UniProtKB/Swiss-Prot annotation:
A Pfam family hit: Fn3_assoc
Native species: Homo sapiens (Human)
Subunit organization: Interacts with NINL isoform 2. Associates with DYNC1H1 and multiple dynein intermediate and light chains as well as actin-binding proteins.
One annotated Gene Ontology cellular component of this protein: cell projection
Zn finger region (DZANK-type): 211-270, 339-387
Location of the protein in the cell: Cytoplasm, Cytoskeleton, Microtubule organizing center, Centrosome; Cytoplasm, Cytoskeleton, Cilium basal body
PANTHER family, per database record: DOUBLE ZINC RIBBON AND ANKYRIN REPEAT-CONTAINING PROTEIN 1
Coarse class of the protein's main subcellular location: cytoplasm
Protein name (record): Double zinc ribbon and ankyrin repeat-containing protein 1
InterPro entries for this protein: Ankyrin_rpt, Ankyrin_rpt-contain_sf, DZAN1, DZR, Fn3_assoc_repeat
Length: 752
């Protein structure tokens, strides 16, 4: 709200909230009050839905605007009220609109000398009998005590417009000409009692801290269920918990042996169910028992100390309490007094209770309900726990005691021997208890643990092998781990600060690290890392390996030159190819271990890899790459000691062969009693293994490798008689011959 603006007026019906009716549903006897929070303003209103015009003069058209002077009533029907507040300097507020559904009710005549406060007070008393709450209206009228002597004359809708002064003119108004009528607070005698839902709704809308029937303050006990003045039920406070236990509601849990309240479903210490513990476990009853004077617990007669509080029990001669029933009341006639602990009646002159030994005559700060034993206020008329009338019972007990005292007063010469509690009950002893299965650390123990954690953290920080913070300059001097940390940290920082390098390094898919070199030139240190590239395409089917240097050396050393037979060329080519592959493996540091050297256990990744290339798998390249990235071994074997590459060949998953070879799988690994390689198995499959044979030859599988029978894969292809498979080996041999011929031709030209 801006400074200097006028607050909009409020249109408030002056009535008690009616159950089942909305705020806009009123009758023709209900007064409407209009007020604004801005002081010294005039309120103008209309009742036909038109805009209030306070500057319009008489004689210039129809004027339906009225000036508010006192609370008004509305005619029956649907009435739309619009009001505006105007200050003395003609500053206007916003227009507020309210629609009321007005019902017709016959008017109730009230004497003129009754003011609004008396009417409210009388109507509140009548409404409270039926469950209405008027505390909210009392608060509302308390804020306007300066209008205590309101004139409640009814101002009905006038027949002619009200005269309104022009701008800057004097103020004047026509006095009301209607007779006075009473406001609509009359109580209907035939109204039915309210339901609990209606009472809850009225209390939620008005004041839940007061009784809905007698408007008395709510009992101080938040768990009281009945009003202590009228005895009607009091709705519970929202979000209340279990009531606090009384003294007699505490007991020992059978599981943890802790003194816990017994009015809860489970033990608050060990969470054991208490319902089963409260049921009697046997039908045996004590024939004789001794009541403890300290806590009032019944104990077996042969015990000397109480089983509950461990206090000394009176001897059998002193105790007159045996059996399950209380001893008879004293036979002497006269006044009696009730014990506040066990409820037994004792003589007026008794200092202690003859049943439980409690001291009598202690002024109680609260009254105890004789039915449920709950504590109530001294002035309470009804019990807040069970709802019975406490005043009447107390009065009856007092009348009875007075009648007995008046009938035959007790002579003072008579004496009554009542066992008093001895001061020297026994020597005090320190008894230690132990809770089995439970441990509660103390504050000292927790502080000690915190100190140990802090000292351990300090020791770890001071350790020599603790990872230090990275610096701008690497340490050098043989600290290769710190050097690698320095390289990785600065490489990450460089990638974060250079988008171009970040985009380039994020694109390729890299495998294992093949080689790494370090070069120093005095100013800079160059580090080169070579990784194997991974792609979904088959990069090994048509890959030609340049073995010119090795073939050249073999051709120069040969005595027959080009005049040798085809078999000699094939053997030379195969031997040179195998030597070259071994050298490449040594350069790339492929450390392959055969099954005879080390038998590895199948880890989950290896098991999934064998399943993917097995008969039930699909041989998906992406899945195989993911498993290899997660740590699967490309040289693992199944239960039959077959390498994974051989399993892929036998199950016709030729797409997985290049991926396994790239990740370090031994392509010439032998298995079984026949010592066959993957190329042998692919050749034995015939046409079904033609694609696997071509893939293995493209990955430089050894043709010269022999099995246990002394046969190469080419020999097996010739035995099967499959021309398509044999042509693959011939193409491989032809490529080798062409390379050797080209190398020999270049040597002869150099000699010339």
């Amino acid at each position: 709200m801006t400074a200097g603006s006028v607050c909009v007026p409020q249109i408030i019906p002056l009535r008690v909230p009616q159950p089942g009716k909305a705020n806009h549903e009123i009758d023709n006897n209900t007064l409407l009050e209009m007020k604004s929070d801005t002081p010294d303003v005039n309120i103008y209103y209309t009742l036909d839905g038109s805009k209030p015009e306070f500057l319009k003069r008489i004689g210039y058209g129809e004027n339906n605007t009225f000036k508010y002077i006192k609370p008004i009533t509305l005619p029956d029907g649907k009435i739309q009220v619009k009001a505006i507040a105007v200050s003395k300097d003609c500053r206007q507020s916003g227009i507020v609109t309210k629609v009321f559904h007005v019902d017709y009710e016959p008017p109730n005549i009230v004497s003129p000398e009754d003011n609004v406060e008396n009417v409210l007070k009388d109507s509140s008393r009548q409404e409270f009998k039926n469950g209405f709450v008027g505390s909210k209206l009392k608060k509302k009228y308390k804020n306007s005590e300066n209008q205590r002597s309101w004139n409640v004359n009814l101002r009905k809708f006038p027949e002619s417009p009200l005269e309104i002064p022009a701008y800057g003119g004097g103020s004047g108004s026509r006095p009301p000409t209607r007779q006075s009528q009473s406001p609509g607070f009359a109580h209907v005698s035939g109204q039915k009692c309210l339901t609990s839902t209606e009472i809850m709704r009225i209390q939620r809308e008005t004041d839940f801290l007061k009784c809905a029937h007698c408007l008395a303050p709510r009992p101080s006990d938040p768990f009281a269920r009945f009003c202590q003045e009228c005895g009607s039920p009091v709705p519970p406070i929202f979000g209340c918990r279990l009531p606090p236990p009384e003294g007699a509601q505490m007991g020992l849990c059978a599981e943890c042996r802790s003194l816990v309240p017994m009015n809860t479903p489970i033990c608050v210490v060990c969470e054991a169910p208490l319902a089963l513990q409260l049921q009697p476990q046997a039908s045996l009853h004590l024939k004789e028992k001794v009541i403890c004077r300290a806590c009032g617990t019944g104990n077996p007669a042969h015990l000397r100390y109480c089983v509950t509080c461990e206090g000394a029990l009176p001897s059998s001669q002193e105790s007159m309490c045996s059996g399950d029933k209380a001893p008879p009341p004293p036979t002497q006639k006269g006044g009696t007094i009730s014990c506040y602990r066990c409820g037994r009646w004792n003589l007026w002159e008794a200092s202690f209770c003859g049943w439980c030994g409690a001291m009598l005559g202690i002024p109680a700060g609260c009254s105890v309900c004789p039915k449920c034993g709950a504590s109530n206020h001294l002035s309470a008329r009804f019990c807040g726990s069970c709802g019975i009338c406490v005043k009447s019972l107390v009065k009856l007990s007092l009348d009875r005691s007075l009648a007995l005292a008046a009938e035959e007063p007790r002579p003072f010469s008579e004496s009554l021997n009542i066992p008093l509690p001895r001061s020297d009950v026994g020597t005090k002893r320190d008894i230690g208890t132990q809770t089995v299965g439970l441990f509660y650390p103390s504050g000292k123990l927790l502080a000690k643990k915190e100190q140990e954690l802090a000292s351990q953290k300090q020791r770890q920080e001071k350790m020599s092998d603790h990872k230090p913070l990275l610096t701008a300059i690497s340490p050098g001097r043989g600290y290769w781990r710190r050097q690698l940390d320095h390289i990785s940290a600065h490489l990450r920082c460089y990638a974060q600060n250079n988008p171009e390098f970040r985009a380039l390094i994020a694109e390729p898919r890299m495998g294992k690290l093949i080689s790494a070199t370090v070069h120093e030139d005095g100013c800079e240190v160059s580090i080169r890392l070579n990784y194997s590239q991974v792609s979904n395409k088959n990069l090994y089917l048509n890959k030609a390996v340049n073995f010119s240097d090795h073939l050249l050396s073999s051709a120069a050393e040969g005595d027959g030159g080009l005049c040798g037979s085809r078999s000699s060329w094939v053997s030379d080519y195969s031997q040179s190819t195998s030597d070259t592959i071994e050298k490449i493996k040594r350069i790339k540091n492929f450390k392959t271990k055969t099954f005879q050297e080390k038998k590895e256990q199948l880890i989950p990744e290896n098991r999934l890899l064998l399943k993917e290339v097995g008969p039930t798998g699909e041989g998906r390249v992406s899945v195989i790459e993911q498993l290899l990235d997660e740590g699967a071994d490309p040289n693992c074997c199944d239960e039959d000691n077959r390498p994974v590459i051989t399993v892929a060949v036998m199950n016709k998953h030729h797409e997985a062969i290049p991926v396994l070879v790239q990740r370090g799988a031994d392509i010439d690994q032998q298995w079984g009693p026949l010592r066959n390689t993957a190329l042998h198995e692919a050749t034995l499959l015939g046409l079904a293994g033609r694609e696997s044979t071509a893939t293995l030859l493209g990955c430089n599988a050894s043709i010269q490798k022999k099995n246990a029978g002394g046969q190469t894969a080419y020999d097996l292809a010739l035995n099967t008689g499959d021309d398509l498979v044999t042509s693959l080996f011939a193409a491989k041999f032809g490529q080798g011959l062409e390379d050797q011929l080209a190398q020999t031709r270049s040597l002869s030209l150099d000699d010339c």
